[in-house]
Curated annotation (Swiss-Prot):
Keywords: Coiled coil, DNA end degradation evasion by virus, DNA-binding, Early protein, Host cytoplasm, Host-virus interaction, Inhibition of host innate immune response by virus, Viral immunoevasion. The lineage of its organism: Viruses, Duplodnaviria, Heunggongvirae, Uroviricota, Caudoviricetes. It is found in: Host cytoplasm. The gene is gam. It comes from Escherichia phage Mu. This is Putative DNA ends protecting protein gam. GO terms for cellular component: host cell cytoplasm.
Length: 174
């Protein structure tokens, strides 16, 4: 049998200012902290941009070399594919320093001009290629919440109040 708890721990109480002046001071402090966080984020983004710019120039020629070498390797492998794949029996060849492989991608569909394609499919009687999505109309439920009151899985929430703190900020007009 489990022992009953000797001591019940409760969460520490959150900080609550005790008067109007403390609230005013705390709102000012929130604004100060938000501005400081914004300054630090800007400084961080500036540093990231500097690092990116510094390394981008060094990375670009390396990427070009990789692309050139890759095209050359692919060209040689295509010319010698029959030998590398044992007459098409395997799809991968081990070349000591790495593997080369050939894979056929699965079929895919791309559609340009969705509305025009839909109209054409309907006109040609090819509705089987058109998917109709059913979904619950939440806007209608909000207009008639009593009609769905007994339906399991539907909860209409109303009267929820959000509290927000908006410290005053002065715009520089820049």
């Amino acid at each position: 049998m489990a022992k009953p708890a000797k001591r019940i721990k409760s969460a520490a109480a959150a900080y609550v200012p005790q008067n109007r002046d403390a609230v005013i001071t705390d709102i000012k402090r929130i604004g100060d902290l938000q501005r400081e966080a914004s300054r630090l984020e800007t400084e961080m983004n500036d540093a990231i941009a500097e690092i990116t710019e510094k390394f981008a120039a060094r990375i670009a020629p390396i990427k070009t070399d990789i692309e050139t070498l890759s095209k050359g390797v692919q060209g040689w492998c295509e010319a010698n594919r029959d030998e590398l794949t044992n007459g098409g029996k395997v799809k991968t060849a081990n070349l000591v320093t790495g593997d080369v492989s050939w894979r056929v991608r699965p079929p895919s569909v791309s559609i340009r001009g969705m509305d025009a394609v839909m109209e054409t499919l309907e006109r040609l009687g090819l509705q089987r290629f058109i998917r109709t999505k059913q979904e619950i109309n939440k806007e209608a439920i909000l207009l008639e919440p009593k009609a769905v009151a007994g339906v399991a899985g539907i909860t209409v929430k109303s009267g929820i109040e959000d509290f927000s703190i908006i410290p005053f900020e002065q715009e520089a007009g820049i």
